[in-house]
Amino acid sequence: MPTSNGLRVLVAEDNPINQRVAVAMLRALGHQGVVVSDGEKALRALSQLPFDVVLMDVTMPNCDGMAALAELQERKRQGVRIPPVIMVTAHDLPGDREHFLGAGADGYVAKPMNVAALTAELRRVLGQ
């Protein structure tokens, strides 16, 4: 459900610099980024507000991206609507994409993110 300003994107990222970069990229693409700093806050935000897509860092304090993804998959099995989740990580070794997709992620973008890769993955996971 895109807003009049594009997509509403939850950015789950603990690094302040990466938060600013992600929000700036989203803004440049005409989207709105809402930032949380860990997986627990991402799960809470997803319970309270509608989002079109989630950019989820893998390594975060309190509740990492993989634990949050597992909880989202459980919610999905219970019939809760979960937006597509794109894992954003510095883990960019052979097999990493398959690992994250196999765990239930809808997409994957390696850090450092660039606008072209983010745009392509947003389009792919949203079927555009």
List where the protein language model places each region.
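Short hydrophobic/Thr-rich beta-strand motif most characteristic of the beta2 strand and flanking loop
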Residues: 30-37, 44-45, 109
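C-terminal output helix
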Residues: 113-122
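Charged docking surfaces used in two-component/phosphorelay signaling
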Residues: 19-28
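Active-site beta3 strand of CheY-like receiver
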Residues: 49-55
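Conserved acidic carboxylate
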Residues: 13
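Acidic catalytic/metal-coordinating carboxylates
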Residues: 38-41, 64-71
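The feature encodes the CheY-like receiver
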Residues: 61-64, 93
